[in-house]
Amino acid sequence: EFRRQGHLMIDFLADYYRKVENYPVRSQVSPGYLREILPESAPYNPESLETILQDVQTKIIPGITHWQSPNFFAYFPSSGSTAGFLGEMLSTGFNVVGFNWMVSPAATELENVVTDWFGKMLQLPKSFLFSGGGGGVLQGTTCEAILCTLVAARDKNLRQHGMDNIGKLVVYCSDQTHSALQKAAKIAGIDPKNFRAIETSKSSNFKLCPKRLESAILYDLQNGLIPLYLCATVGTTSSTTVDPLPALTEVAKKYKLWVHVDAAYAGSACICPEFRQYLDGVENADSFSLNAHKWFLTTLDCCCLWVRDPSALIKSLSTYPEFLKNNASETNKVVDYKDWQIMLSRRFRALKLWFVLRSYGVGQLREFIRGHVGMAKYFEGLVGMDNRFEVVAPRLFSMVCFRIKPSAMIGKNDEDEVNEINRKLLESVNDS
């Protein structure tokens, strides 16, 4: 019966992908639609898979925004692949809970291996790899990765300055940094007044300025505060700009800040030699993360985090109650990933990434990235040939930022009016 139902499910998904281009990309339903058409209570008696899938087709799919549609261009991609789906299926089927090495050695050791593989593809410094004293871990999202490293940085600093100084710790980023950092800072107990989102400008292509960073640090030091943590970005959400890592890390190290590099979207591109330059300076960072579920054909969720000093994470995140004690952990020769993350339980994420790496290989993965960049470059050229539009930020990867030119709007010279016209264009595209 399991085999029969499995075939039904694969056929259902295959049919969905065959037709996905025909669905409206954005769901057309109204808020609360589903509660109105589903029963008020769960069924008392079992229902067949056929009946359930029929409801998926008629009630669930109309409420889905189809992220895998070829017509979906919003946000960063959530790329999937056959290899990713199958790896996820196997992981779910095994249903192991790999919180430490003993409960599923293969889950832990495969994660060790694939994060080292991926790190080598990115030409990360050896100090970020298990083979060089560092190591990688697969988290759910960048939010988790940033929170874990921020907590590690916080505790390392407070062990030196005293726990009562948590209110003096300061976190730095640009006004283009992902909001994940702000959320992590709140959870980690950083005083909201000590969160520095340093202003960027169009003249610098919205990069974080090292001089402004140093000025902010000096100002805080003069006021008795303790600079703690810098988050630099490779591929910002708004424009995919790249912060100048070499100069920023030089400033940060001068004042003993923990440096995290968030490359959630654009990091995957750096497996291509022509994009690796954007990671120059990462050798001076303390941690680095990217989301394989964004641009690396790996299904959600799969955030890869590398750290130079795993002991900093472990000191902050480890717990060792009686029921978790075992001989393998006590040897200190194995990795217990529960001590590298927020949760205790964890999924076998490494399987799907392993499937992707093996099914496509480095060569095809590079061509996949280059294909997307090539399409973006082509679109950028089309925008450039139309005098009604302008590209407003340099295209570095596969995202193009453009708008209607103010000069194309008769009598519309006020910036607010220009923005409103462009907002209406955006809304009309999304409604189409």
UniProtKB/Swiss-Prot annotation:
Cofactor(s) needed by this chain: pyridoxal 5'-phosphate
Enzyme class name: lyase
Catalytic activity: L-tyrosine + H(+) = tyramine + CO2
Gene Ontology process terms (BP): amino acid metabolic process; carboxylic acid metabolic process
PROSITE patterns xref list: DDC_GAD_HDC_YDC
Keyword entries, A-Z: Decarboxylase, Lyase, Pyridoxal phosphate
EC number(s) on file: 4.1.1.25
Gene3D superfamilies to which the protein is assigned, alphabetical: Aspartate Aminotransferase, domain 1, dopa decarboxylase, N-terminal domain, Type I PLP-dependent aspartate aminotransferase-like (Major domain)
Stored InterPro entries: Aromatic_deC, PyrdxlP-dep_de-COase, PyrdxlP-dep_Trfase, PyrdxlP-dep_Trfase_major, PyrdxlP-dep_Trfase_small, Pyridoxal-P_BS
Domain of life: Eukaryota
GO terms under cellular component: cytoplasm
Annotated SUPFAM superfamilies: PLP-dependent transferases
Quaternary structure note: Homodimer.
Family: Belongs to the group II decarboxylase family.
Protein name as it appears in the record: Tyrosine decarboxylase 1
Source organism: Petroselinum crispum (Parsley)
Gene designation per UniProt: TYRDC-1
